[in-house]
Every structure is written in structure tokens, then in C-alpha cells.
Amino acid sequence: MDLRIFTEPQQGASYDTLLTVAKAAEDLGFNAFYRSDHYLHMGAGNGLPGPTDAWITLAGLARETKRIRLGTLMTAGTFRLPGVLAIQVAQVDQMSGGRVELGLGAGWFEEEHKAYGIPFPKEKFGRLEEQLAIVTGLWATGVGEKFNYDGTYYQLTDSPALPKPAQAKVPILIGGHGATRTPRLAALYADEFNIPFASLEDSEKQFGRVREAATAAGRGADDLVYSNALVVCVGKDDAEVARRASVIGRDVEELKANGLAGSPAQVVDKIGRYGEIGSSRIYLQVLDLDDLDHLELISSQVQSQLN
């Protein structure tokens, strides 16, 4: 089981805080550092010091880390034109020496679009499909060749399709709970399918839909990696679990029901159950980015048991 650190900087985190967490995750042996792509905090609090841009953040981390993979859950398709996104991700991949992964979604949080003057079109899913076709098409076009695309929402003419990523293929993540269109899109474009904040039962059903869609698309169902994103709250004892839950404003029993919470042994057991239904990666949503002892505990007493 591959454990990855997943952060929500819009809730209140500077670049320096994210750098500290990414370096700690790398030093502790985690395989990847991911972040959300949001410009407005959610729920209680003020979100200070304010949002950080996902790909500017990852560009900085690319130069200040050595091994850990870097990515987004998920880049909002509404924030970026597909040609520009292809350039940005390819450049960050070059800057990292080939450690970037792209999670791309349609965008869903209307309030942040209103807050920063970003259009929030009704046809987000149709745009997402064209964005995936364009980004992957640009990267797959040979050097010296031209890329053209004539879609409903985007048109590209005689694009040199540069720059190229350092990797031969940047892994693409697609995720969500949708029962029909999401599995089909994953089958067409994804290297990994991720379902966020889902129960074992719902995860198993959605993985099954994606596997069926992959087969229908002529792919092997096992060609994709299947993963979950779950909030994490681990403590050496009940008091420590309760303290960590309180800091992030959550109830312990709710966290145990909907995430990965409890003692290291309890969390290892629950992760194992996700593994049994086909998940091979867990993105650990870490909400208190100042608590590096939490990461150390997960590394030494959860990750070590799973490895």
C-alpha cells in the first residue's frame, strides 16, 4: 500500500508551511506530496494567510525536494486553459526531474469562482473531456510535428506542442463519485482513478464501474491504479486522537466512520480493508499542517506496518 500526503492549503497555509510538510514527508519515506487546487477556504475560519496557487507551489517544491512525487487532487479545469496547463505541468515536470502527476477535475466550488472573477460554466464536464484530450494530445505529439484540435469549447491550430515533460508519460488522475460519465472518462484517459472520502462499500462499487468502463473501452481493468483519499487522525492513545480531532474541528467518532482515525493498529486495519477491495494507494488528508509529529507517527507506526 502506497501512502501519500494530501494537503488542503486553502484552509490556511503559506508556501513555507507547505515546503516544511513536503520535506518532512520526503524525509519520512512517503512516496508523494499532493495538494488541492482551491482559492477559497471552506467552513469555519478565515483561511489566512490566503490561497496559494497549486502549480506555482509545486514548481517551488520541485526545486526544493529530491525524491518525492508531486501532484494535485484535483487541478480545477475551470482555472486554466488546456494549452496553458499543458505548458505549466510539463515545465514543472522538467523542474522536478520527472516527478509530477496531474490530477484533473471539472471544478465544482462555485463560491471561489465568484470570489476571484473566474467563469463557472454550466458545461464543465464537456470542457474537462476536451481539456484531457488536448493536454494528453499535446504531450503525445512528436517533436517537430503540429497538434490541431477542433472541439466544441477549444480550438488549437498548428501548435508546436512544446515543451515536453521530462517523463515519457505524466500520470493522469481522474476521480469522483459520478456513476456514468466519470468512469467513462477515467477509462479513456486515466492512469489512476481516485475516489475521495468514500466508504468501503461506495469505493468498491465505483471501482467496479471504472473497471467495467475500462474493459468496454478496450483497456485492461488492471491497467489503472485505484486509490482513495481519506482524512487521517492517528494518535498513540485515545487522548491524543481526541486532541488532534479537536484541533481540526472534527468529532472522533465521525472521523472513525468516515476517515482513518484511531490508534496506529486501528488505522492499519482499516487501510487493509481498503486494500482488499482494490485500492493500492491512500492519499492521507492531513488538515493540521503544523503537527509534524503526526506525520512521524504515521510513518513509524502505520506506513512501516503496511510496507
Pin down the residues of each PLM region.
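Active-site-adjacent structural elements that line small-molecule/cofactor binding pockets in enzymes
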Residues: 1-307
